[in-house]
């Protein structure tokens, strides 16, 4: 029934709640419809749906861990004027993390968008990561050090810790700008926490994740 509701709001071009945290069960685990896959050789961070007094949030906490948390979309999101909007806060960042260094490239939370082939762990899809960084310059971005099919954009950093931050991005426009080609459909969205490089502690919360069409 919840999947049917998601399909309906996507079709009607009204905000689509991709988390549905309000109806999620409090306690450890992910909201319904979401999956987890640990980065190879790593344990997944701990997840918990909590109520912070203003509503339900998903808390992600780990140290020396890394995993993908994702929701595959059906139907896929075709190119449009839509935007992805979310609200998050970071309570603890891994010490010495730096997006500019391969050996220090950790983040307390990244929100990512998968374009193309839905098998997001294969080699066909392209992924944009909207990342909570550290002390890198505002607006810092680059191709991933792992693959040119992955692209990382810093949208917040160390000065934004402990505060709820609202973000809104246009993934299709970013895709065109980055890869200079027509974007395929969006097949999945997800969040990620990785502290496997620095082995530091990280704690982050996300309250809302929506697809909005004006």
Segments the model singles out, each with a brief description of its role:
Residues 91-160, 200-205:
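Extracellular ligand-binding interfaces
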Residues 21, 189, 207-211:
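Extracellular beta-strand elements of beta-rich domains used
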Residues 14-40:
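Extracellular carbohydrate-recognition regions
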Residues 72-84, 158-161, 182:
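Extracellular/lumenal carbohydrate-interaction signature centered on repeated Trp-anchored short motifs
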Residues 80-91, 187-193:
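A short beta-strand element within beta-rich, extracytoplasmic domains
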Residues 45-68:
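Short carbohydrate-recognition loop motifs
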Residues 106-111, 147-201:
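Extracellular beta-strand ligand-recognition surfaces/modules
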